């Protein structure tokens, strides 16, 4: 295929994070067709000129990702600790250049780690097993949630995945009100990145983590639990299962963890006292 033709194919869709490419179906290997594929790019988070981490992510809402990652990793305590942020292209991907306060940057340098880039991986590159896991203050018990309201939210979670609807290749994370209404959500090829985008956006907008819960389309790994708890989320619903370490972390930090969420079904792993039906 000529380069000009390939360029035209790539520009067919106007949805950020999607490209059309030429491919072949099993039942017709002689005739290529066009189909949508989710973009995945290396994204480097650069704090005060020093690259801290490279993650594979969808190339949209990266400011929210950077803010959410900074909060959920304990690099900052609030959005006020970031003085400026720019997303710029680099030779192999994108950079989010973040200007931290001096105090926060000094703290980052003291415990800096290098992460290897894998899709949404929250463990890659830690130097010792003891470095896995961060101290999280036990969460308060300030709210309850009616599980009967979960079904409607599950039916609308896909509304926050325009790329996923075209490609079947993204995860979603959304904020769910006690009524079951989803009032904000993000998608990404990496489940941790999708969650960071949600955490970053709500924090930037000054929204409270009270009176609601996080709903994710993926499994619940320990990183998902820890990121949620670091930002003050008390209840985490996951469409798929939870891991043993996720359950242990949730139990320890008082987070209510619910998996296998389907209409009419849910498995409560920890702290059911926040739930009713």
Swiss-Prot record:
Gene3D superfamilies the UniProt entry points to: 3.10.20.10, Cytidine Deaminase, domain 2
Top-level taxon: Bacteria
InterPro entries referenced in this protein's UniProt entry, alphabetically: Cytidine_deaminase-like (IPR016193), FdhD (IPR003786)
Keywords: Cytoplasm, Molybdenum cofactor biosynthesis
Binding site for Mo-bis(molybdopterin guanine dinucleotide): 260-265
Annotated GO CC locations: cytoplasm
Active-site residues per Swiss-Prot or TrEMBL entry: 121
Main location: cytoplasm
Gene Ontology MF, one: sulfur carrier activity
Subcellular location: Cytoplasm
GO biological process, any: Mo-molybdopterin cofactor biosynthetic process
Keyword Cytoplasm on entry: yes
Pfam family, one: FdhD-NarQ
Function noted in UniProt: Required for formate dehydrogenase (FDH) activity. Acts as a sulfur carrier protein that transfers sulfur from IscS to the molybdenum cofactor prior to its insertion into FDH.
HAMAP family per record: FdhD
Family: Belongs to the FdhD family.
Protein name: Sulfur carrier protein FdhD
Organism: Shigella dysenteriae serotype 1 (strain Sd197)
Organism placement in taxonomy: Bacteria, Pseudomonadati, Pseudomonadota, Gammaproteobacteria, Enterobacterales
Gene (name only): fdhD
């Amino acid at each position: 295929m000529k380069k000009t033709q390939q360029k035209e194919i790539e520009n067919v869709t106007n949805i950020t994070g999607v490209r059309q490419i030429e491919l072949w179906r099993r039942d017709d290997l002689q005739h290529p067709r066009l189909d949508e594929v989710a973009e995945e790019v290396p994204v480097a988070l650069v704090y005060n000129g020093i690259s801290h981490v490279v993650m594979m992510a969808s190339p949209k809402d990266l400011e929210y990702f950077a803010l959410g990652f900074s909060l959920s990793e304990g690099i900052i305590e609030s959005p006020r600790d970031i003085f400026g942020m720019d997303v710029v292209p680099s030779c192999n991907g994108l950079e989010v250049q973040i200007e931290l306060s001096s105090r926060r940057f000094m703290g980052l340098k003291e415990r800096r780690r290098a992460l290897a880039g894998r899709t949404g991986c929250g463990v890659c590159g830690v130097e010792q097993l003891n470095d896995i896991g961060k101290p999280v203050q036990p969460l308060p018990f300030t709210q309850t949630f009616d599980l009967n309201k979960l079904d409607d939210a599950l039916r609308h979670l896909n509304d926050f995945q325009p790329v996923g609807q075209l490609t079947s290749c993204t995860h979603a994370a959304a904020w769910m009100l006690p009524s079951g209404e989803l009032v904000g959500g993000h998608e990404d090829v990496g489940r941790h990145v999708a969650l960071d985008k949600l955490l970053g956006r709500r924090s930037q907008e000054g929204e409270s983590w009270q009176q609601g819960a996080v709903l994710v389309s993926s499994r619940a790994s320990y990183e998902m639990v820890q990121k949620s708890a670091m930002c003050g989320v008390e209840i985490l619903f996951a469409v798929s299962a939870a891991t043993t370490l996720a359950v242990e972390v949730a139990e320890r930090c008082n987070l209510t963890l619910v998996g296998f969420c389907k209409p009419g079904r849910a498995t409560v792993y920890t702290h059911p006292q926040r739930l009713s039906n």
